[in-house]
Every structure is written in structure tokens, then in C-alpha cells.
Amino acid sequence: MSLSLAELEEVLRERRREAPPGSYSATLLSDPERVSRKLLEESFELGVELMRPEVDRERVASEAADVLFHTLAGLVGAGVPLDAVLEELAERRGRPRPE
């Protein structure tokens, strides 16, 4: 079973809207500072895993999942749709890099 980023985005929007008791996502989405702190923490942890001399693919996948989850939570919290990010990436494709 797989979950697309768009599906995860929709789940997060639903959690924000409904705020079910005990939901980690709902709690996270109610506090933008907490989302930011978690994103920084998870990004750091992913970076650490990627710097290891022998990369543990399972750990990298786990940390990358945390980064993607918290990135989407931040986007949902800020009202920025995933499509806006994908459009930005598409616009960058083929654009010369600044020197």
C-alpha cells in the first residue's frame, strides 16, 4: 500500500478541520511554532543519517518520511497547497542556475 503526498495533504487538511481528540496531526497543526520545530528536528536527523559512512536505507526512509510529513503539515498550516510547491518546482525545471 502506498500513500501519495496529495492524499497525505488531504488527511492533514481533514485533521485540521475536524481536530479529533488525541490526533497528533491535529495537535501539531494547532501550533505553527511546534510544526517549525519538528521540521527542523526531523531535517537535522535526516541530514545526520545521510552523512553516515554506511547509509542505513531504512533509517533514511524513516527520517525522510518524517521530513515529508512535517513539511506537508507546515504547508497545510500556512495555507499553501502542495500544488503551489509542485508548480514552483516545474517552473524551475530547465531554468538556468544563478551564479
Segments and roles (model prediction):
Residues 1-64, 68-99:
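Flexible "arm" and connector segments at domain edges
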